[in-house]
Amino acid sequence: MADLRFGEQGLQNFTPLMDLVPRQENMLQRMGLFSVVDYTTEKVTEFERRVLGIDTMYSVERGADRQYAGDEGAQTALLKIPFFTLDKVIKPSDVDQLREFLTATDPETVRSRVEKVIARIQRGHVELHKNVMYEALVNNKTYAKGKDGNDRVGYVKNFQTAFEIDNAEMYNAAADGAATIDLDDQTANPADEFEKFRKHVFNKAGDGGDNYRLVVLMGSGSFTKLKNHSDYVEAFANYASNEEPLRQRLGGLRTSRVLEWQGVTYIEDVSGKIADDKIIGFPLDMEDMFQLHYGHADTIAAQNGDEAVSEAYLYVREVDGRRVGVESEAALVACITRPELIARWSE
């Protein structure tokens, strides 16, 4: 039975076909940075920020008053889930192929033709996920841009503001963890600045742990300057033999330049989402720090909870007697629950 979109005629749900052309993962996904925490039928979703604490255990006499552990710090932020659409008009014959693929005994006979219909739509969803994740990491806020390229009021929230975190808690005691670095200065060792960040993360993490990796993601221009800096030339020269194992641990980075040195992993970002003179530092393996929440489709069935929440949706609707519309959509929001553990440098 066709799903009904609000105020429109019947739709046929072809969402399973989105899996036919898998989304290509961006660098942040290959690193395993963002985890999917929730699939919700609500239009507003809740993110929790937990700050762990450590209690000191003192030596006491047996039978003496006992010590008690404190409570964990927790804050919540309510964020609207932005909704995105990408449609395409196709021929009725293309729809027949979609139906045939879903019902055919031998679907391989039409697979290649169906893939062409889905592939263009899926590339748009790939770009959407990249924008959502990089906006969170680079600009410390949710992604919801309108057609004019401007942030949509009510949907875009700064994470530091949402969790009411004072600048004093942020790296460099600055809003959004902003800082500056001069990679052209050969008299100053950049490692000193990155060591300052490493200590900041350990001090603010609150869990006493040392099992997470520290990553410095760099625009290509900044990475080249670091590679050519007098204090790093030798490190890069001696690194080639270890580069490939590291790539595998970080999800098989194929084209980016990488260096692991003195407890920090430097990675060149080639996505185009980080400017040449920008640098982002953050810890990996921090549980639930980078989250994705997905919302429901814009159909009556989804609104009533009768349609499963998914990462993307695909529907077919007749436009007129000669044309058919393919309607794809997604509802998702990213959140960084520990923004105080991120540094954002500008040259």
Residue spans of the language-model regions?
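Long, contiguous amphipathic alpha-helices that act as assembly "spine/axial" helices in icosahedral shell
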Residues: F84-D166, N189, E193-G221, R322-E329
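Short, Φ-rich (hydrophobic/aromatic) sequence segments
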Residues: L17-L20, E193-V201, L292, A297-I300, ...
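Sequence/fold signature of self-assembling virion shell proteins
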Residues: D184, H229-E347
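Charge-rich, low-complexity N-terminal segments
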Residues: M1-N13, E193-E243
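Hydrophobic alpha-helical segments and helix pairs
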Residues: F6-Q24, R152, V156-E193
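Short alpha-helical segments and helix-capping/turn motifs at coil-helix boundaries
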Residues: M31, R198-F202, E311
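Assembly/oligomerization interface modules of large self-assembling protein complexes
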Residues: L33-E100, G154
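N-terminal alpha-helical "arm" segments
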Residues: M1-V44, C335-E347
